[in-house]
Each structure stands twice: as C-alpha cells, then as structure tokens.
C-alpha cells in the first residue's frame, strides 16, 4: 500500500500531524521508535506552558494564536481540559530583552498583557518576592497544556479516523526516488508520496546533516500548599534572574509545584547519555536560586525527571523541506519551546501533504539561514 504521508516520529508534532492529515482525507502512516506518549523525548512531565505575547520573537505570534484556536478545539474531545487558562506572569528586570519582546508582541498583536511593577506584583501574589527593579507582564489569556493527554487524544482521534499507526518500530533508513519516499523499519518497508520527519531529539540519526544539538534537561516538583494553586488564582510563570538564567513553572497541583530551568543543561550525543534525574549532581539544586529568591515559601524537592531539548544553533525552529527532496518536510530544532505550537505545526505538515501553500511566513525557519 502506498500512503499519502508517512510520519517519522509521533510525539507532539507528529501526533498532531497524523490527526490533521487523516482528518483531511489523506492515507497516513504514523511511526515511532517507542509507544507515544512516552518518556524518551520532550513531551512527558504532564504540563507545558503556552504564552501568546512571545518573548522569543514576534514571528511566533501568528503561529501561537492559531495553535491556541486548535488547542481549544482539541479540548472539546476530552472531559478533562487539555488547556488550562491559569494566566502566565513573566517576571524579570525592567530592562530585560525577553520582556521587551513580550511587550512588543503584545502591542503589535493587541494582546491582553498587563504590566505590573514590583509592588503591584507582590500585592497581587503575596507568595512572589522580587527586587524593586523587577516588573511582571501578566497574560491572563495564557496558561498551560496537559502534554501527554494531548498526544493521547491526537493518537486516538487519528486512529478513529482511519490512520495507520506503527509504534515500537524505529525507522532505520529513509530512501527517496521519483515515486516518493520509502522507509525501512523492523516491521518492513513502507512507501508514501510524502514524508514528515518529526523525530525530535535524535533526528540526526536519520538526517546527520541537520544542525541540531541534543541537550539533557531536568525539571522537578517541589512541596507547595494551596496558596500556589489555580484555586487561589496562582498563575503559571516564567522568571529571569539577574544573571540571565531563565526559569519556568506551573501552579501547584496536589501540593506539588513543577519548575524547570530553561537555559543550561548538558550537551549529549546519544540516548544513553540522558541520565535520569539526580544522576547529575546539580539536578536537585538547579531551581534553588529561583525558589529561594522568588518563591521562598516553596518546600523541598519531591521528585524530578529528565528530558531532552533538540536545540538549533539560534534556538529558533527548523521548518523546511530537506535539501534536494521537496517531498520530505522536516520539523525539528524546537529548542525547548515547541510544544505549545504542536497543533499548528501539525496543521502545517498536513497542508504540506495536501500540496497547499502555508498560511504563515515560514521564511525565518528555513535551513538556508544557517548557510548565510
């Protein structure tokens, strides 16, 4: 059987692409080396932030606004909401370049963002402590996503729509010819007119020339009481320290508050190098500088997990066809800030398989930027 689209890697982007392409009437085969959702990539750990006024650059705002529409639609397919509108407060020095980008994005796209000085911040959320030179930019319409629930939902909807799914079966080789794309797996060879490579951290095992660096990252859950929960209107957050370190976190659930450090981590070259949480001496203490100074009421570390970022050289996404192979789209280099975009990236992949022109300017995400 010849498929219209083969998806290599069915984590966040691949799961979304499988659903949207199948829903559009295409014959789709989804593949994955493991059984998604799983612990081997970048989507586990239950929750991910979604921010609209984007500190990483205005070019992302149209994408994330479309993603939000798709998240809202996906949430209707579950009794438990996939998106929780907790609000997100971005904390940092008043002269922070990241916060300047947030403010600029909000102004350009007329987004609901409130600026609070240090006193106003600590009055609204007495649990937060910041220096006098800090500000907060609060996005009331943003919040967090339940990442594994989202992937489970996409997989179920795709399967119900007739999508073929081949999991626990790594792709070993990709071949291109005039008739399309052929993949080799432990279960045999499969052929399609087009392919999406959304293999996450270890994409270079299939496409060695891609400029992607795997980075081992950790996040952890700390003891917290009801003051830090959504019931008390405590928001999700990002926080920039005076030395430039960037943290992110979520409202407490079941008396546990999850937090991670966005920058840093350990460069790795193979899956076995992604050691479990606490295998690196600094893991348990990584969040201490932020907690001690900004959230001093949080208790000790309860447990943690390791994941991986697939970093591009500039930490912007890679969304492009493979050089010389216009029938193969690669989406990678999401650099630790990609999950919130998964539905719109999946929709872009489905449009690619349908032969449609993208609805967004994807020029900033082309591979050619690295050869200029």
From Swiss-Prot:
Residues modified as S-8alpha-FAD cysteine: 307
Cofactor stoichiometry and binding remark: Binds 1 FAD per subunit.
Keywords, in A-Z order: FAD, Flavoprotein, Oxidoreductase
Signal peptide stretch: none
GO function term, MF aspect, one: flavin adenine dinucleotide binding
Bilayer-spanning residue ranges: none
Broad class of enzyme this protein falls into: oxidoreductase
Highest taxon listed in the record's lineage: Bacteria
Residues at which FAD binds: 4-34
Catalytic reaction annotation: N(alpha)-methyl-L-tryptophan + O2 + H2O = L-tryptophan + formaldehyde + H2O2
Pfam families: DAO
GO CC, any one term: cytosol
Enzyme Commission no: 1.5.3.-
Assembly with partners or alone: Monomer.
Free-text function comment from the UniProt entry: Catalyzes the oxidative demethylation of N-methyl-L-tryptophan.
Family: Belongs to the MSOX/MTOX family. MTOX subfamily.
Protein name in the entry: N-methyl-L-tryptophan oxidase
Organism per entry: Salmonella typhimurium (strain LT2 / SGSC1412 / ATCC 700720)
